[in-house]
Amino acid sequence: NYYDLDGNLVDNVRKDLKGKYNTYLYTDKSVELVQNHDQTKPFFLYLAYTAPHIPHEVPEEDADRFASHILGKRRNYAAMVSVMDEGVGKIADALTNNGMMENTIIVFTSDNGAYYKSVGSNYPLRGGKGSFLEGGVRGVTFVHSPLLQKSGYTNTNLHHVTDWYATFQKLAGDKP
């Protein structure tokens, strides 16, 4: 049985998806949403992949791609990152093929540093997920859009996702 946050029984659980790798499911659904979008209306897609997260589980055929050069748990981690990267690429291709990329902002970010007790590394930073040290709170981000006035540079300043709101408003034609 499955229950929502209020304790109510959820009847419409997709049992036919049992055993499917959720990174593939999230990507396929996102591509479907892009392909079926009415382009006369605004479009917002928030995709929160669970990869690469503990437990480091991935279909065996994906992990096997790294078998010759990555050992142990890092093989699954590498495969998870690779499948996620390919998924982002498929979504970007769908946006391009549907004429939406020229008016799109893509933000890719993480919520914390790597968990140092597993396969991650934040070297040369100290700490990791769950700590307030820089290795725990610093994450990677990229922003891609033809709408940006300045591109192709690296910003190492401290920022938070809430700092972007005014920029996104301006790019959307609204006043911050």
Residue spans for each PLM region:
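Formylglycine-dependent
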Residues: N1-F43, Y49-V58
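Alpha-helix capping and helix-loop boundary segments enriched in small/acidic/polar residues
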Residues: L17, Y21, G72-S82, Y116, ...
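Active-site-proximal beta-strand/loop segments in catalytic clefts of secreted hydrolases
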Residues: A48-A51, P59, T109-N112, H144-L147
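Metal-dependent active-site segment of extracytoplasmic phospho-/sulfohydrolases and closely related
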Residues: F43, A48-Y49, V83-G120
